[in-house]
């Protein structure tokens, strides 16, 4: 049984009961509601944990963890460039199935620098500056041989420093 988006949201509402290491995580909320979204490959939420900010992903596709492990190995072998750090936490999220048995699921933490998504940044930065920052990011990705394969505004963060970095590496090559 795979966790649902509703279950993921419930787990984030009371992390100390559902997560092995992320029990002290604080999810992003709107009012009293935990903000969780769904992409093609994962459920995701923004969290604060140990004084740092992360995207927390619960993969909904079997190859996502394997792909992230591969990206991390390659990033360590070469210069990380604009890539953000990913940490796979194995058997992190606990689910109690209908038979009363515990099941554990892997999650991914991806470093999230302070900033805003590209789609929001267009109202705060000059378009020419954003365009140049995107070209620089693409050049840095090319220099380390990294192909994101789904680089669009929802997968790009503009850091407070103006540096542009990619998020969500499921489709990377």
Residue ranges and their predicted role:
Residues 126-140:
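Conserved alphaE helix
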Residues 32, 40-85:
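ATP-binding glycine-rich loop module of kinase domains
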Residues 1-36, 66-71:
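Juxta-kinase regulatory segment immediately upstream of eukaryotic protein kinase catalytic domains
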Residues 83-130:
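Conserved structural core of kinase catalytic domains
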Residues 168-172:
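Activation of the activation-loop gatekeeper triad in protein kinase-fold domains
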Residues 46, 112, 157-158:
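Conserved hydrophobic "DFG−1" position in protein kinase catalytic cores
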Residues 142-159:
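Catalytic-loop of the protein kinase fold
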